[in-house]
């Protein structure tokens, strides 16, 4: 969360393309992930983990301790307590994080272009919308505008389907005063 995303893209691109060698010793072997969706998934997972940790930790800390303590008294293990009590009670926080992460990944232009390149078969939705502007007679803004409106349909469906959890998930981990 401290280092800006843009500063870490080139080192990550070098890592995905050729691995990591330090003083002649191969630390991470050549991954050859450049130009694949796996590289974009790794990047988005790595950049999304701090937000997930921040949001879900605060949300889970706001859950009532008496519920967890009663599960321990009943003889539930840590895994049983987590999967049968904490996780179902955290659905609102998980849905809020899932909404944030989906909207960030879906609307991402920079990370996808850096790791995927400009091959037509590897372009994501935002890259396709950006390429709609150049025509034979100049820029065709009506194509870009209509492409942007059409590309907003999927995020709107996701947001409206998770909307009831969204506010509860954000408020659930906040400080009560």
What are these regions, as identified by a protein language model?
Residues 1-177:
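A hydrophobic, multi-pass inner-membrane permease signature
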